[in-house]
Amino acid sequence: LFMEKKRVYTFGNGKAEGKADMRELLGGKGANLAEMNLIGVPVPPGFTITTEVCTEYYDLGKDKVVELLREDVEKAIANIENLMNSKFGDVENPLLVSVRSGARASMPGMMDTILNLGLNDEVVEGLTRKTGRPRFAWDSYRRFVQMYGDVVLGMKPVNKDDIDPFEAIIEEVKEAKGVKPVSSTHLTLPTICS
């Protein structure tokens, strides 16, 4: 019973396994991304994990859900790699993806996002070579680490009076390096990396 259910719906290159009227199953964002592909809007390829998987996660636990999803997610990532002519984790031609949460009903500002998944200490060097823009690559990596820390590890302020731990580190580096005005856009690559 568990193995036969479709849990991952792909989209990309003008094709989609889902469509707009599948909001209950794919969430609003997933259904809209599928529909945009079907009507020809240029949307990067991706995949949606169904809303039912959230219920399975609570009922069956993380390990069982990972087991149920692994093969389909690996196939979906391979499809993105093929369409984008890049490879997840590849140092020379890296594929970076975004992980965006969604729901059946719109909840602006309530759902978390992680951008630039796929960056690590080696891949950032490859992205630097590929783009010729080291500041872009390293800033993307910083943003990934910050979002991952926030969303996955819970490294974020508990209330509005708390200081964000990542922002505190950035401010400390900017102050130590004498960066004024204190804006991350004024940080040079050597400052970011030292």
Identify the role of each PLM range.
Residues 2-187, 194:
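Nucleotide/phosphate-binding sheet-loop regions of phosphoryl- and nucleotidyl-transfer enzymes
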